[in-house]
A protein has these predicted regions:
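Short amphipathic alpha-helices in soluble, non-transmembrane regions
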Residues: 71-76
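Mid-chain, well-packed structural core segment of small domains
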Residues: 78-107
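P-loop NTPase catalytic core of nucleic-acid-dependent motor ATPases
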Residues: 52
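Long, contiguous binding/interaction regions
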Residues: 1-44, 48-49, 63-70, 91-93, ...
Length: 138
């Protein structure tokens, strides 16, 4: 789990969370936060059988680069303030056709439709299981 103090942020700026999220809970939380900013085709891939550097990929589509940035920002801000979780690294925000946010246990991939069709991560990792998204309560 990413600790805010590891990223150079003073720990005192964050409210105390009652418990840490498991990697699967974090993946589902990220997926639902992306959906809240109208991301489409949200998929969670269980990467544990295939790679050692992360547990899950969350892959989603934004209508355009502006929405890709908005999704990335929403996830980052909500996790930062509500769960005390920060990404270790974010790349691709300038062009915003494929933004990758590395939360260590979970990697968020936000694509524009063209970039998602071009890179086809689901096909590349077609042998790993996908995780069902639970309905958002409320």
């Amino acid at each position: 789990m990413t600790d805010p103090s590891d990223a150079g942020y003073p720990e005192t700026n964050y409210p105390r969370s009652t418990r840490q999220l498991t990697p699967l809970e974090l993946a589902r939380r990220i997926a639902h936060l992306a959906e809240s900013k109208l991301a489409s085709d949200v998929v969670i891939l269980d990467m544990r059988p295939a790679v050692s550097y992360t547990d899950f990929f969350v892959i989603c589509t934004a209508a355009n680069p502006r929405q890709a940035r908005a999704i990335t920002d929403e996830v980052r801000e909500k996790l930062k303030h509500e769960d005390r979780v920060l990404p270790r690294h974010v790349s691709g925000e300038r062009e915003a056709t494929w933004i990758v946010s590395d939360y260590l246990d979970v990697v968020l991939h936000v694509f524009t439709p063209e970039a998602r069709a071009y890179y086809r991560l689901e096909e590349l990792w077609g042998d790993v299981p996908s995780i069902e998204l639970e309905a958002v309560a409320g």
